[in-house]
């Protein structure tokens, strides 16, 4: 059966039995299959799981999460059944600082965060790559649905074959230096293939559901942020774009740009959240046309391939976005760029990522400022 699931060699100049691969194991089906597949192909696999949260027991029984409680047990059990070493590293304090606190502070700036990108950018890639080097391994392998293509010494990050599972949007902040050591063996497969492989390898987690939503949010977003930043639930005013007071809100944590439902105010036309003014603790609302825009300013740029001035690309403005045609332009501000969409787009949210593609290839991107 394994002949149906061929992958590119992890290293072109080393045979599998000479190649040591650290596999980041979350306890889910994808990373477990990646580890089992490589082990069966003869690679020297070392499984590593990061304990990111939940040592207080709060997240241990939560379904659809990862990297805590049951998931750690599942990763260890897979390693034992397949027959490769597995290590558990406690990264809870680092995760709290780099991801959870950033999540809360982003909301407090009136933005909508994507903690999964921050986690990949810091804990999972930056720190795990250092662990990989410390263990004397050749590569770091993850179960992400994304493809890494290498030609003439140049590495490209590309969309997964399975577009319904593609995770390239969440990996836009990966650097060229990191890509040299990273490998994504599942990018050429469909999720259904991975389920088949899990059963073929007799993995106990073959039917385990995929992780969903934000792993450390055990309640609602608002309750989680309220615990991290109590000031986010202070009452304030809801005003229109001209500053007229329309009502009162119960905390900015309950609102996000583009939101229509749950505003708690009556008006003669539908109103949407236009902006969250954290300085004045105000939620600014207006008609839908105010939310339609073509021009986007992005910051903290990461280009896997430096775009030329006016380069035509397709951009994704949220993970579920199918993509919009656009051009990329330089600005006078350091580490910022301007993206001009061909057509108006509704509800562009500061704090989200703007990721540029050229066909299947990830060019790079940045965080939306405005």
UniProtKB/Swiss-Prot annotation:
Residues annotated for ATP binding in this entry: 24-31, 50, 143
GO BP, one annotated term: tRNA wobble position uridine thiolation
Cellular component aspect of the GO annotation: cytoplasm
Region annotation (Interaction with tRNA) ranges: 165-167
HAMAP family for this protein: tRNA_thiouridyl_MnmA (MF_00144)
Cited NCBIfam families: PRK00143.1, trmU
Protein's name in the database: tRNA-specific 2-thiouridylase MnmA
